[in-house]
Amino acid sequence: MRIIFMGTPEFACPTLQKLIDRKEEVVAVITQPDRPRGRGQQTLPPPVKVLAEQHGIPVMQPVKVRVPEVVESIRELAPDLIVVVAFGQILPKSLLDIPPYGCINVHASLLPRWRGAAPLNWCIIDGDTETGVTTMMMDVGLDTGDMLLKKTTSIDPDENTQSLHDRLSIIGADALAETLDLLNAGKLVREKQDDALTCYASMLKKEDGLIDWSRDPRSVKNLVRGMTPWPGTYTFLDGKMLKVYRVRIAEGEGEPGTVIGAGRQGLEVACTGGSVIIEELQLEGKKRLPAGDFLAGYKIATGAKLGHKDAA
């Protein structure tokens, strides 16, 4: 079976590697253009491109996959199936209609929950205790196609998006392999999604990481977990950004956003109905440190206020 693989970030690499290991006929990989990334804004290739080139697979990097010339070049490759994992562009109907076996997407949630761009983040932010991967037939909607196979995993109450990302990328590769086996055996069963059960995982922005201390401790912890490592959570102390990487829930009382303890255990901040202890942080212009180490050299008084940059 002639397969085109479409994907871009690290999350997609285990699935491509699985296709390679299975000796599937991957005739091309389509990924996003090389783009500036990281602190130095160095132009770097997508991880999927690097993996494809290591195995001698032809790579295409269209700025827009929907333009007619690109669609035509894909048609000329005569794929039987297109596999899509975190590609980053919407596929037009003209492209979806090309392969006789359709386009199968590996989506990092238990559909119909968390359709959209950032399911890994939102399932943690919302406090879900279980998530997984769904393989689905793609249609013109946003993650609305028929479901094929699901694999579930529990979410540890202390894990962040990075560890969940790494685990689901492997689960996704296994799910795709099982889906292909069912397809080859003629046993693939399609299941319609129930739109009434859906919710959307919208793309996150840096400003979404500003901590609202008027929330309850569990919600604050879930935000920190769900936004780590990107886009990150933060607050402000005396007008300086304070990045927050890890917290634990406590039972202190005080005005939300007020520092109610600072010591070797961390920086305790009042929320509504309790408190959190910041265990790892980074003040603007300083190194990322365990909070106890940071507080050994930088005094923050009990009663100090955390909040918006312009907060008094």
Curated annotation (Swiss-Prot):
The keyword Protein biosynthesis applies. One of its GO terms (cellular component) is cytosol. This is Methionyl-tRNA formyltransferase. Its EC number is 2.1.2.9. Disulfide bonds: none annotated. InterPro entries: Fmt, Formyl_trans_C, Formyl_transf_N, Formyl_transf_N_sf, Formyl_transferase-like_C_sf, Met-tRNA-FMT_C, Met-tRNA-FMT_N. (6S)-5,6,7,8-tetrahydrofolate binds at residues 109-112. Keywords: Protein biosynthesis, Transferase. Pfam families: Formyl_trans_C (PF02911), Formyl_trans_N (PF00551). The keyword NADP does not apply. PANTHER family: METHIONYL-TRNA FORMYLTRANSFERASE (PTHR11138), METHIONYL-TRNA FORMYLTRANSFERASE, MITOCHONDRIAL (PTHR11138:SF5). It comes from the Bacteria. Attaches a formyl group to the free amino group of methionyl-tRNA(fMet). The formyl group appears to play a dual role in the initiator identity of N-formylmethionyl-tRNA by promoting its recognition by IF2 and preventing the misappropriation of this tRNA by the elongation apparatus. It catalyses: L-methionyl-tRNA(fMet) + (6R)-10-formyltetrahydrofolate = N-formyl-L-methionyl-tRNA(fMet) + (6S)-5,6,7,8-tetrahydrofolate + H(+). Belongs to the Fmt family. One of its GO terms (molecular function) is methionyl-tRNA formyltransferase activity.
